[in-house]
């Protein structure tokens, strides 16, 4: 998610520098992916807390624990929430056929190049077997939150605030 936000944020910042008065940016951008697929959003707090808790267990040495979200997040949920945080509209996930009908724009080609590694996650259905981690964390109070618009806004908002602060 953070790579997607950073790539999009960089494009939006260039636009906003040229047109500083713009609020909501309309950016017609087709991104290769499927709304029906999922991404595995995992808050860093959950990962750190889970790592610390599992590392304290004597029986965890040498084991593999996937600190993943047991309920993957549909692309149709996270994309509009991230766009809202970035104050942008017009971004949509499309299949490869969309680019056969109308070739990529320069911006789409640049964005695709920046996101090349991550496209596999936008198109595929990544599944992580997190049963060992869930078993190890049972009755500890450490649980990965279900991704809602509110949680995604918090995660994405934090990162956008960080990027904005760096460019000051």
Q: Which ranges hold each PLM region?
A:
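Hydrophobic alpha-helical scaffolding
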Residues: 37-41, 68, 123, 145
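Residue-level signal for the nucleotide or nucleotide-sugar donor/cofactor binding architecture
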Residues: 42-45, 73, 128
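NAD(P)-dependent short-chain dehydrogenase/reductase
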Residues: 1-39, 44-49, 82
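A hydrophobic C-terminal alpha-helical subdomain
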Residues: 11-31, 97-143
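Amphipathic terminal alpha-helices
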Residues: 129-168
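Ca2+-coordinating acidic residues in Ca2+-binding motifs
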Residues: 46, 77, 132
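Mid/C-terminal beta-alpha module of Rossmann-like enzyme folds, strongest
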Residues: 50-117, 159-166
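Amphipathic alpha-helical segments that line or abut small-molecule/effector binding pockets
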Residues: 44-56, 149, 153
């Amino acid at each position: 998610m953070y790579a997607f936000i950073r790539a999009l944020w960089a494009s939006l910042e260039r636009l906003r520098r040229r047109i500083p008065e713009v609020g909501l940016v309309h950016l017609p951008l087709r991104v290769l992916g499927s709304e029906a697929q999922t991404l595995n959003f995992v808050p860093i707090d959950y990962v750190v807390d889970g790592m610390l808790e599992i590392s304290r267990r004597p029986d965890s040495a040498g084991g593999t624990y996937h600190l993943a979200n047991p309920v993957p997040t549909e692309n149709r949920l996270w994309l509009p929430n991230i766009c809202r945080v970035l104050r942008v509209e017009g971004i949509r996930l499309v299949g490869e056929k969309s680019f056969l009908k109308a070739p990529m724009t320069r911006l789409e080609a640049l964005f695709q190049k920046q996101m090349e590694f991550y496209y596999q996650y936008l198109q595929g259905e990544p599944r992580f077997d997190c049963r060992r981690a869930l078993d190890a964390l049972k009755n500890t109070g450490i649980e990965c939150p279900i991704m809602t618009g509110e949680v995604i806004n918090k995660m994405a908002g934090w990162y956008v605030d960080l990027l904005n602060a760096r460019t000051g």
